[in-house]
């Protein structure tokens, strides 16, 4: 029988230097690391739980493009484009937004931000996922972006947990 979803959210802010500010979301997913890795790093994976349409080129400098609206055109104005900065297969993925969707309120602030996603075994069929957002400044625009990702990353983690919980039933 599957265990209940568990979600632990940690927020860490280093007040001394803007460069040290980070946003951390962490939780356990009821699936092995390999399955969670594929859910984040393959077209089939991201389209199964995260986005309506997507594509990913898993390589340094590769693009991860997606849209949330099934009616939107991938490559059109609503496309979100992230560039892969680095990765260690099955362990870590770092990305930076290189194209925000048209009308995104934080388009300037996001230029300084990047995310690192860690995948760690938390048991034979469980994965501890840790999403770290970095590059937030002390200015108002950057703090608004931070709030946006605080909600968004928590939501993303919850959706991933729900996706695998449904598969386990």
Which positions does each model-derived feature cover?
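Hydrophobic h-region of N-terminal signal peptides that target proteins for export
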Residues: 9-17
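Short beta-edge strand/loop motif at the mouth of beta-sheet-based domains
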Residues: 44-79, 87
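Positively charged n-region of N-terminal signal peptides that target proteins for export
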Residues: 1-5
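A short, structured loop/turn motif at beta-sheet edges
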Residues: 30-34, 58, 85-93, 118-128, ...
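Hydrophobic pocket/interface hotspot
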Residues: 36-37, 46, 64-66, 84, ...
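Hydrophobic ligand-binding cavity/cleft-lining segments
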Residues: 16-59
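Hydrophobic/aromatic beta-strand elements that line small-molecule binding cavities or substrate pockets
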Residues: 25-27, 53, 79-86, 112-121
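Beta-strand/loop substructures that line and gate deep hydrophobic ligand-binding cavities in soluble
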Residues: 104-151
